[in-house]
Regions:
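Donor nucleotide-activated moiety binding/catalytic core segment of transferases
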Residues: 235-274
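Active-site and donor-binding regions of nucleotide-sugar-utilizing enzymes
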Residues: 17-18, 22-151
Length: 364
């Protein structure tokens, strides 16, 4: 496979992100990679000489019948991949491997074996197999998985890089000049647990109509899972009440981050841990909009966000309150950094003997 995003030399450890191609899984991998590459953490692990760093996640697409088996019992998992994808599993192996999704788990375990344990392996989301196969297992608290090497997160590990925030803020600076209160409305869609039915759309549209009449500026965005008929419906609604609407490139540059930055509140449908976590990362008052269906796992997610003060159920009214932003990707990145430093201790600084010299935190 042509390593288009492969850098042979870089400052610090080499990191590979891996996903199974699902957008939500890839987003969590990118979030942890971005958090790990923040300036403060990068300086603490800059002494680790890595090779073969990849800036963007690798997509592994195993085929049947392997994909029909439990994640912990795939015989010869490399045989499930294409020739190009199999070619990735050869030296030099990365210092850190960060993967998400059940179908990536057999390859996380395999890279650990092939590297002789040198690669620090991080698996995100419940792989439905033993946590002992990974150096770190990162799972949502609502999945109810525990262990010595398990990090439980509230929601998903979201992260927005400072430079991305700055450039987005500048590109959409006109939003800062708008008068009155604004609300981002994030629409999900059908999933195993929830369905975006016509009845749910009726209820939400009526509630948004009332908010528009109260002079709330609405910014509505759809996701990849939003049914086409729901997209069409809320696009027409936005035109009718003067709201903004975005569902893809045909609507112009993606304003998702800008709307998170420049909104006073958020309405998020209940079906997506990632979307709820994005709003919580920004500290927005989250109003969870109900769809049809439920699951014990999502019930626990909603309760954890509500108990932390991040969210409330949406009843048609918008409130504003404050809470510490939810920065779970940073917590995961800190755990990765600590394990890296334990494996690769920072070198002593020659010539620094004066105990009165106070070093920056990242040099201590």
């Amino acid at each position: 496979m042509a390593p288009a995003s492969l850098a042979d030399e870089q400052l610090g450890p080499s990191v590979w992100g891996v996903s199974d191609g699902r957008a939500g899984n890839a987003a969590q991998v990118r979030a942890v990679m971005r958090a790990l590459s923040s300036t403060g953490r990068r300086m603490q692990i800059a002494h680790i000489a890595g090779a073969g760093h990849r800036e963007t996640p690798i997509v592994l697409t195993p085929r049947a019948p392997w994909t029909l088996l439990p994640g912990g019992s795939w015989p010869m998992p490399l045989a499930a991949l294409s020739k190009d994808q199999r070619s990735l599993f050869q030296p030099p192996f990365p210092d850190v491997w960060i993967a998400a999704g059940r179908r990536s788990a057999p390859y996380t375990a395999r890279i650990r074996e092939l590297s002789g344990g040198r690669t620090l392996t991080v698996q995100i989301l419940d792989p439905k197999t033993s946590a002992d196969k990974f150096d770190l297992l990162v799972v949502p608290q609502h999945d109810d998985v525990s262990g010595a090497n398990v990090i439980q997160t509230v929601g998903s590990p979201s992260h927005f890089a400072a430079d991305h925030i700055e450039t987005t803020g500048q590109a959409f600076a006109d939003l800062a000049d708008e008068q009155g209160k604004s609300c981002i409305v994030i629409l999900g869609g059908d999933s195993k647990a929830h369905r975006f039915t016509a009845a749910a759309a009726d209820r939400l549209e009526a509630q948004l109509t009332a908010l528009a009449q109260q002079k709330w500026r609405l910014r509505i965005t759809a996701s990849r899972r939003t049914p086409v008929e729901i997209i069409a419906r809320f696009r027409a609604f936005a035109d009718k009440v003067g709201a903004r609407f975005w569902s893809g490139p045909q609507d112009g540059p993606n304003p998702y981050l800008a709307w998170l930055l420049y909104s006073d509140a958020a309405i998020v449908t209940e079906d997506s841990a990632n979307m709820l976590s994005d709003a919580a990362w920004h500290g927005l008052p989250i109003h969870i909009a109900r769809l049809e269906g439920s699951s014990p796992k999502f019930d626990r997610l909603h309760e954890s966000l509500i108990s932390r003060g991040c969210a409330r159920w949406f009843d048609g009214t918008l409130s504003q309150w404050q809470y510490p932003p939810l920065r779970e990707a940073d917590r995961v990145a800190d755990a990765i950094m600590e394990k890296l430093i334990a494996r690769h201790p920072q070198p002593a600084l020659k010539g620094v003997k004066d105990q009165s010299v106070v070093l920056p935190d990242w040099l201590e």
